[in-house]
């Protein structure tokens, strides 16, 4: 029963700190310090200093600010406008019309951003006014944008996959490559839903189709070519083993700066604002990660993760039941915490359980990110809902209801990934073979 008491103690103190308005990172450090002072004889100060320094000086973590900066640079370019202009001629004849621009546009921007909120904001900045002008139904317009924006967490480069990789000491390159096929699969599921919805509600869909010759389509899409080359360069360099995730991130930043320069959107103000935005985001994430690592150390000293893993093992839960319980747990947790906090707060306890159950940690990372994606469109703390609320001038309840079908489709995606784990594992296996 000791492990149950310790679990309740840690959770209670953490919730108290969080409820008091203390920063997430400071809350985790505070819980860790109290736990070590009460239940171990280890010196708290030395352990905290060593752990936080070790986490902050991690070479693997270097990829984080670089990928964040790449997204910040491109967020300030004409990419939003180019995405709509380049994709709309190809999408308009599909059932669902230009709604597909939301899905494909989010998938493309996700491949250079790594942030769900930035993906929604960038694509929505152009698509919302354009689709409203063409009288597309608000429900499918906002729902598709909210759901598709979550691809920013899964399709590489993904900030949350970097954090997960650092937390469980798994290869970030493998995690990035593992997210490609599930990300494309979810995008296809969303597009299929848009097609079915539009066929059922065909009376509500606009009938206007702008005519383009094939050469006009190619010309309008040409503006997306530099972005596609940048995406292929970053992901391709990781897959072929030419570059590590950190080196690929450096390549991405240089490419983003060059692209921004030639689009005439790079000046001293945009350079400074992108750098400042990346610094703020990266410092916040690194601080949370440092607190999480110290919490993991403190729990390790108390023996809590090991004892919980043994306790779970003695319950004789089947692996699928454990995964189902964790899915419900993370959905509920995601209703109150952002995705990054949900991951770093729980990995110290969850990781031993997953390893004990025999799951591949690369596969579990993809599973976890998809579930955390679902939380991005669930109230009351669904970040994508807040972003859309500000852009669309609709109440939170309406946007959440519009996004709910996409939430159910993501549940379907989780089931598919659980039943067919090779969807996430095949590409990393091929990558290892190519490198060797």
Q: What is the meaning of each model-derived region?
A:
Residues 1-436:
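Alpha-helical transmembrane segments of multi-pass membrane transport proteins
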């Amino acid at each position: 029963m000791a492990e149950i008491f310790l679990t309740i103690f840690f959770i209670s103190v953490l919730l108290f700190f969080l409820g008091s308005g203390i920063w997430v990172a400071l809350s985790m450090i505070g819980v860790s310090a109290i736990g070590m002072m009460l239940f171990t004889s280890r010196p708290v100060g030395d352990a905290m200093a060593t752990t936080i320094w070790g986490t902050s000086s991690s070479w693997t973590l270097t990829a984080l600010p670089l990928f964040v900066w790449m997204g910040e640079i491109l967020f300030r370019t004409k990419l939003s406008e180019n995405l709509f202009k380049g994709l709309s001629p190809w999408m308009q004849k599909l059932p669902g019309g230009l709604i597909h621009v939301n899905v494909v546009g989010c998938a493309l921007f996700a491949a250079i951003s790594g942030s769900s909120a930035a993906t929604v904001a960038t694509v929505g900045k152009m698509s919302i006014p354009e689709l409203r002008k063409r009288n597309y139904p608000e429900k499918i317009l906002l729902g598709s944008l909210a759901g598709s924006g979550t691809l920013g967490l899964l399709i590489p480069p993904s900030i949350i996959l970097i954090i997960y990789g650092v937390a469980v000491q798994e290869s970030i390159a493998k995690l990035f490559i593992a997210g490609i096929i599930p990300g494309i699969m979810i995008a296809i599921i969303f597009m299929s839903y848009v097609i079915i919805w539009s066929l059922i509600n065909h009376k509500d869909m606009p009938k206007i189709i702008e005519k383009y010759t094939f050469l006009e389509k190619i010309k309008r899409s040409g503006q997306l070519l530099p972005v596609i080359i940048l995406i292929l360069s970053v992901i391709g360099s990781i897959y072929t083993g030419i570059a590590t995730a950190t080196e690929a991130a450096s390549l991405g930043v240089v490419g983003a700066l060059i692209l921004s320069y030639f689009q005439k959107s790079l000046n001293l103000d945009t350079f400074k604002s992108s750098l400042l935005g990346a610094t703020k985001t990266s410092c916040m994430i690194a601080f949370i990660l440092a607190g999480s690592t110290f919490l993991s150390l403190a729990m390790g000293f108390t023996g809590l993760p090991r004892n919980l893993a043994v306790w779970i093992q003695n319950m004789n839960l089947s692996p699928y039941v454990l995964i189902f319980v964790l899915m419900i747990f993370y959905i509920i947790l995601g209703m109150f915490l952002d995705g990054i906090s949900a991951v770093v707060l729980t990995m110290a306890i969850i990781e031993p359980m997953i390893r004990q159950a025999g799951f591949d940690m690369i596969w579990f990372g993809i599973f976890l990110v998809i579930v955390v994606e679902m939380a991005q469109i669930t109230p009351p703390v669904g970040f994508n809902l807040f972003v859309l609320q500000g852009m669309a001038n609709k109440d939170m309840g309406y946007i959440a209801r519009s996004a709910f079908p996409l939430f159910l489709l993501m549940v379907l995606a989780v089931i598919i990934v659980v039943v067919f784990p090779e969807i996430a594992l095949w590409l990393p296996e091929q990558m290892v073979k190519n490198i060797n």
